[in-house]
């Protein structure tokens, strides 16, 4: 197997793009590489669903992503809130499209199938690029949540989507010198570039924690995220067929890879949540039970409050008019 050849990968793992690459076969009179083992189909209401277990995991991933987005949106003053939300939106869109492709909503061999797989490849690259750009937010090189920050992330993610989409479609349709048997370009943009971007993100976050935070616990979130992602890729590309045969085609590597990817994304959320905090004064209006009066002060103790430990630096309630600071706080 040469560099950029998908034959060995597709024999082991039931990837959606494998139906659109490889040499022309005499049996099917078309391109495609069939995996050695893949999960059995299930029938629900006279409808055949491919990859039943992986499809169910995609649905669970969609639900969990919605929960994470709601939690992120609830931290109104956290650093990088809008940027990390963009990442979760892209991941949710990628998961939904993967559900459609894996479950057979768009069946392999149909006319629109290559386009859907090309969009899936583009979304995968856009999601990884968005995550890498998120890695720079914590260094405060530019103000987070501003049009500069958001549009830079959107444009970079859009560029990654367009490049991967066009390369994948050109590979499937034999355009611009690419083709089902010339898959080097697709391999580079879909695997090498994405791997480099993930590596950059991890290095940036390790540097951020080591150089700017006193708490080292977020390194555990990074380590667990790396473990889950790498474990999913190893199972998918190195152990899918043996696992599938051992459990009688009930599951294959695609199910485990989908599960591990979800766990890795959850670790990204956990890491972001652990290094950011919300300014209480801006959130008290949305959380009704933050303050509860236990006992009223005696009449003789009702006097001006002294702010000895107040982070805003006022000495008494009468020194100057109080106005809440607009600055957001984080542990960076």
Curated annotation (Swiss-Prot):
It is found in: Endoplasmic reticulum membrane. Residues 309-332 are annotated as: Disordered. The keyword Translocase does not apply. Coiled coil: none annotated. InterPro entries: Chs7. GO terms for biological process: cell wall organization; protein folding; protein transport. Residues 313-332 have a biased composition (Polar residues). It is a multi-pass membrane protein. One of its GO terms (cellular component) is endoplasmic reticulum membrane. Its main location: endoplasmic reticulum. Keywords: Cell wall biogenesis/degradation, Endoplasmic reticulum, Membrane, Protein transport, Transmembrane, Transmembrane helix, Transport. GO terms for molecular function: unfolded protein binding. The keyword Endoplasmic reticulum applies. Pfam families: Chs7. The chain crosses the membrane at residues 52-72, 87-107, 116-136, 158-178, 184-204, 219-239, 249-269. Interacts with CHS3. Chaperone required for the export of the chitin synthase CHS3 from the endoplasmic reticulum. Belongs to the CHS7 family. This is Chitin synthase export chaperone. It comes from Chaetomium globosum (strain ATCC 6205 / CBS 148.51 / DSM 1962 / NBRC 6347 / NRRL 1970).
